[in-house]
Amino acid sequence: PKSRIEWIIIDDGTDKIEDLIESSNIPQIKYFKYDEKMSLGRKRNLMHTKTTGAFIVYMDDDDYYPPTRIEHAVKMLQTHPKALCAGSSIIHVHFKHIGKIVEFGPYGPNHGTAGTFAFRREMIENSTYDNDACLAEEKHFLKNYTVPFVQLDPRQTILVFSHDHNTFDKRKLLDN
């Protein structure tokens, strides 16, 4: 149920959203603001210290997540009890500058992009991100892709948006 979802927001942006959080009246939101810009690895590790749930499901602020995102990810972890982490090795990226959605992947059975991750609490008790990682942070967290993993349906997981402020310029994906 939605009442059991804990929303952790780590806000290190220049345009803080504290006013939106306060006016939302959603008690499950835990909002933490920081003046310094953080690397993705450090931000994800920090967020992990703020969570209390049995399952953690990522939802980055600049992508679209379907309404089925959380339910699908948790059910996949529940039906695959040996998997510590779930994610999608296939992603769909919307490129505004060309007006197209392009599919990338799959990259491997134990691979997923971090924005698609959902995992058991046990995962963060045994693994961390490289604090200095600004992109491709998944490899360290997934211990060189050896963590027991289950693939999620990409259409129930994420639609990535390519924009000028991405930590990685996703337009470079089109060069391959």
Where are these regions (language model features)?
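Conserved donor NDP-sugar-binding/catalytic core segment of glycosyltransferases
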Residues: 69-100
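Acidic donor-binding loop at a coil-to-helix junction in glycosyltransferase catalytic cores
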Residues: 133-141
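The conserved acidic donor/metal-binding loop of glycosyltransferases
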Residues: 60-64
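Short aromatic/hydrophobic "clamp" motif used to bind/position activated sugar donors
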Residues: 56
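Conserved nucleotide-sugar donor-binding
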Residues: 52-53, 111-127
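Short, acidic, metal-binding catalytic loop of nucleotide-sugar glycosyltransferases
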Residues: 1-4
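A recurrent flexible, glycine/aromatic-enriched loop bordering the glycosyltransferase active site
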Residues: 84-86, 98-119
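Glycine-rich, basic loop-to-helix element that forms the pyrophosphate-binding segment
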Residues: 34-51
